[in-house]
Regions:
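A hydrophobic, small-residue-rich beta->alpha segment in the mid-to-C-terminal subdomain
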Residues: 61-105
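Structured beta-strand/loop patches that form or line metal/cofactor-binding pockets in enzymes
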Residues: 17-63
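A short, polar/proline- and glycine-enriched secondary-structure boundary/capping micro-motif
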Residues: 6-9, 52-53, 84-88
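Charge-rich, low-complexity N-terminal segments
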Residues: 1-15
Length: 126
């Protein structure tokens, strides 16, 4: 999906995203107006297809990973998981699912495989 922000921000104004349904994450490339990459943002998600409605439901599992052009990797919003668990918004099963997906995502990020997985989507749409 190619997109523009409703209100351009100082950091970025547009991007492109690709959802890996079977793996449980969406990777987005955030860019400035001139096309310069600001960072890549990886949302860990749960996806559910409702056949009778022909509709996909995506649920954000809170923890995200940012990958900067320098190669620096930042895991963000981890504290939100504890808050959501304490308040009953998510259960232990969802936290386990999130941790398994985070582990697999970090494995492909640190190995560099994410670049090969996204190249065709980001290069042709950027």
């Amino acid at each position: 999906t190619k997109w523009n922000t409703f209100k351009p921000k100082k950091e970025f104004s547009k991007g492109v995203s690709y959802t890996f349904l079977n793996e449980g994450y969406k990777i987005s490339k955030f860019m400035k107006d001139n096309g310069e990459t600001v960072y890549y943002y990886c949302d860990i998600i749960n996806s559910e297809y409702q056949k009778e409605k022909n509709t996909w439901i995506f649920t954000d599992l809170l923890v995200d990973v940012k990958i900067y052009p320098s190669g620096f990797v930042e895991v963000v919003d981890v504290g939100e998981v504890a808050e959501a668990l304490d308040s009953g918004l998510i259960n232990e099963e969802t936290v386990k699912e999130l941790l398994v997906k985070l582990d697999k995502l970090l494995e492909i990020v640190y190995s560099g495989k994410w670049k090969d997985m996204t190249r065709e989507y980001f290069d042709m749409r950027a």
